[in-house]
Amino acid sequence: MKKYLWGTPTTNTVFTGKQPKYTKEVRKCISIDEVYNVVRKVGDGTFGSVYLATTKTPSKEVVAIKSMKKKLAKVSDATRLREVHSLLRLSENENIVNIFDLYIDQFRCLHIVMEFLDCNLYQLISTRKNDPLTLEQVQDIMRQIFKGLNHIHTNGFFHRDMKPENILISSNSDSSSFNVKIADFGLAREINSRPPYTEYVSTRWYRAPELLLRDSYYSFPVDIYAAGCMAFEIATLQPIFPGNDDFDQLYKMCEILGSPDEQSQNTGDKGGGIWDRAELLANKLGISLPKMAPLDFGDLFSPPWNLAFASMLSQLLKWDPAKRPTAEMCLDLEFCRVSAPADAVASKEEVNKNTDFRVSISYFPSSSSIPDECNTEEESRINPSTSKFLKQLNKGFNGFTKPFRKSRKQSKNRKNKSSVATQFSEESEDIADSITSSTFFPVLPQIRPSTPLNLKLRNFIISSSEDSTSPKAKEFDRPLPSTEFLVAINKSQEALLNNSPNSKSGSTQLSASTCLSDLISPQLSILSHEDKRENQSVNSESSKYSPRSSNHSPTLHSKDLHRDMATVNNYAKSPPSFHATQDLLRKTLAYTNSSGTSTVLSNDSSAISSTFLDRDFPDFGITSLAGSLTLPDSKIIDRSKTHVSTQLLP
């Protein structure tokens, strides 16, 4: 049998031109079971499947075997496969998965024998649930990832598919630290190779802007950007840019990083910075990026995460690839250099609240969590709603049929909506009018996972400074609308609640979905009984969206939908004024305490709870509704100390 030798070079053969010292050979076998005891299948990918196996020696060492799906034309092609070629050209490194042997079976299928680690980074994140890693653990993981990337880039390669699934992890003996190794070099390319490259590059959530905008040239900065996305996910256990498609991915990036133009980035050093080439690439695709102000990563985290860690994210997640640091420079960043959170400048009260140095994040709804398995790039981790009512509501809000407007065509005149990014911070109010003058960007995708924007706005509410001069009602102790129609609605609902044995005090409650549909368009309020029942069933599932407080749980539902249908039809023919409808939306939501008693809060300021928005309209979430309701004199008020996620409308 002819032997095809292969080996791992001990020197940098890419730039020195020296030939590596070959020490091993590609071996033939009838079946891989002949050489190893295959235990079980542990993973399946685009190019191959991974199996857990043990050697047939007394020591029974555990290994991982990647069996390639594509058959080889001849044995010599084994070392020409991109993954094998990349691993052979890279010298052994403690943060790169080691390759032990290469076998070809009788069917000419290649089997790569590698070292086995306990799990990958995605599995680790999924098992942590609401138990985030400590600051020291995140530092250690990111430091090892940067070391592995530095080794890959120094040897003239870039990975192109950096994602949590391709980061292998094993716990050390003390269980507080991890051994991290980069794996899966099936998409790796040499830095000095010429384009065009293969079309499939990286998983969308970790894909750099130059890849999304179809730039013909890209290099190692795509790995740095992906590392920044993973750093956020390691710390918060949630992805930062969970896009449904490439267009939605760009929107979420603009939502957090801001638009890559000079006008939007006129806010200092925060954000993704300016990238002039982005507009050129977008025009080639026939799209126009939204105009949004960037967010400050320092505002998204509590001490000590808001300092060195936030600074690292802002440097890694730059629009312009040339402005991202190299892997070697990343190792010199303050976050990777410090071994303890000694750089955190915070008050004693803040330090006492964060003694375990964990990320301070709000509760994530169960509907926003990531499923247990995701093995392919195109497999969606989002389960969008298909409700007929929500589709009508989408159409009523934006009226768009395409995710982006064409840059060369004049769009129809529409009302300018406030950018979510500008509502986020009062610092951006001065430039909000200038950067939101373009056509309102499409509504956020259905049931999107939480992003930093959702996390921050979860501790905020929308409040209106509109003063009510209407007389107080004796029974309800709240302002009543002035129109005869709304008075009739209140009387009808009062009669229904007084007849209810479970209600001790009368309170008007209407479906929040019905109220909002009335606010948008009278035609949308004429719904079938089936659609209303479907919407009511969504509200009945409220317990799984807000389990934080057992003493105060909001309840949003409609009373006797059949009896209300006639009133809704009459409203469609002669709707009241816009402000009167807003009063109906604000004042028909009640508060239910732990004993089941329904009471209506009396408060001069009108507010819409973030929990109400998240629960009753998962299609839009907080971020979209905040800009679409266009309440008079609306502003963002910080009530994070009062846990407004469990409060309801007065």
Swiss-Prot record:
Keywords: ATP-binding, Kinase, Meiosis, Nucleotide-binding, Phosphoprotein, Serine/threonine-protein kinase, Sporulation, Transferase. Pfam families: Pkinase. The modification Phosphothreonine is found at T469. GO terms for molecular function: ATP binding; protein serine kinase activity; protein serine/threonine kinase activity. The modification Phosphotyrosine is found at Y200. Residues 403-417 have a biased composition (Basic residues). It catalyses: L-seryl-[protein] + ATP = O-phospho-L-seryl-[protein] + ADP + H(+); L-threonyl-[protein] + ATP = O-phospho-L-threonyl-[protein] + ADP + H(+). Residues 536-556 have a biased composition (Polar residues). PROSITE patterns: PROTEIN_KINASE_ATP, PROTEIN_KINASE_DOM, PROTEIN_KINASE_ST. Residues 36-336 form the Protein kinase domain. Its EC number is 2.7.11.1. Residues 397-428, 526-560 are annotated as: Disordered. The keyword Repressor does not apply. GO terms for cellular component: cell division site; cytoplasm; cytosol; nucleus. It is an enzyme of class 2 (transferase). One of its GO terms (biological process) is intracellular signal transduction. The active site is at D161 (proton acceptor). CDD domains: STKc_MAK_like (cd07830). The keyword Transmembrane helix does not apply. ATP binds at V42, G43, D44, G45, T46, F47, G48, S49, V50, K66. Belongs to the protein kinase superfamily. Ser/Thr protein kinase family. Protein kinase which is essential for spore formation. This is Sporulation protein kinase pit1.
